[in-house]
Amino acid sequence: MLEKSGSVAETFGIPLAVLLELTHRCPLQCPYCSNPLELERGGAELSTDEWKRVLSELARIGVLQVHFSGGEPTARKDLVELVRHATEVGLYTNLITSAVLLSRERLAALADAGLAHVQISFQGSEATIADRVGGFAGGHAKKLDVARWTRELDLPLTVNAVMHRQNLHLLPDIIELALALDADRLEVANVQYYGWALKNRAALMPTLAQIEDCTATVEAARERLKGQLAIDYVIPDYYAARPKKCMGGWGRQFFNISPSGKVLPCHAAETITGLDFPSVRNGASIAEIWRSAEAFNRYRGTGWMQQPCASCAFKEIDFGGCRCQAFALAGDAAATDPACALSPLHDRIFKTAEAEAASGSDRFLYRNFAGGTVEGA
């Protein structure tokens, strides 16, 4: 049992699924990249043996699923070995990939090693827009090939479509693409604006009319395709009246491990300054980090909350919303998430969204290890 100062004692069981960011290396240059602003270099990454130790410990403490992610996880030459080890210790394995580095032979080797599921990101339904958004020529065609190979190998497939102002008009076609690829699930995820995406907000922010059309399209498709294609949907917080229950609440249902072994309450947590995130390299067990690390306990439960969250009837439903967004927009990770109508900043961010959506700006600051490249510069 974990004692949280300022609140009742609560029990936080080990999450059933964990995200493993094997590397921050990636051939794509997406303008909404969710990796931290300070990317971890290849030389800092956990070794094969270190990742195997992590996988064994995760299985031992009760984790059931691991999601191999990045960056681009297929940039790791030892990925097949890691998938095989995860399978041997009893973990369900999911690969979250841009797919552009995969050959059919390597995908088959991953399947033989026990890979259970593949999730491929798509930047659009056709190559011109998709390749421009990802900053990678030929990427869309390669993704289509890998998606087909995935189904030929009898692996379940999820299509992950990251949506924004410059591709939302393609949503009906993306739904049809997911069907044509025989995907089991489609994730329609509007960009969330922190980290690198915040730098490109003016080029990415959709209009409210676009979001309303998007929502109607998703709802109609869910009804039409019930039992055929599962569709998950996330809207941009700037147009919401209530904050999302981010990651199920800070330190309640989720953690991920960075390429260098840092254990994080969410993949964007490093955007919050002043928090120290323990590493699996420093000798502490993952279970002990989950239970006792100050970074996890800082915003766990409700005892940390300021007003109006502290007296809100929804505080144990949304747990104050997103801490990373509160820090990015309010400068205080303990502040009310500005996505909430009770935040004094709510009207301001709504107006910001409307203004930037109407700005006409469409040039991207691409994400890469050089720090960023302006489109067309």
From Swiss-Prot:
Protein name as annotated: PqqA peptide cyclase
On subunit structure and binding partners, the annotation says:
Interacts with PqqD. The interaction is necessary for activity of PqqE.
Q: Which family does it belong to?
A: Belongs to the radical SAM superfamily. PqqE family.
Do you know which Pfam families this protein is assigned to? Fer4_12, Radical_SAM, SPASM
Question: Its Enzyme Commission number?
Answer: 1.21.98.4
Cofactor(s) of this protein: [4Fe-4S] cluster
HAMAP family found in the cross-reference section:
PqqE (MF_00660)
Q: How is the cofactor bound?
A: Binds 1 [4Fe-4S] cluster. The cluster is coordinated with 3 cysteines and an exchangeable S-adenosyl-L-methionine.
Q: Which UniProt keywords apply?
A: 4Fe-4S, Iron, Iron-sulfur, Metal-binding, Oxidoreductase, PQQ biosynthesis, S-adenosyl-L-methionine
For the biological process aspect of GO, one term held by this record is:
pyrroloquinoline quinone biosynthetic process
Q: Which InterPro entries match?
A: 4Fe4S-binding_SPASM_dom (IPR023885), Aldolase_TIM (IPR013785), Elp3/MiaA/NifB-like_rSAM (IPR006638), MoaA_NifB_PqqE_Fe-S-bd_CS (IPR000385), PQQ_synth_PqqE_bac (IPR011843), PqqE-like (IPR017200), Radical_SAM_PqqE_MftC-like (IPR050377), rSAM (IPR007197)
SUPFAM superfamilies registered for this protein in UniProt = Radical SAM enzymes
Q: Which GO terms describe its molecular function?
A: 4 iron, 4 sulfur cluster binding; cyclase activity; iron ion binding; oxidoreductase activity; S-adenosyl-L-methionine binding
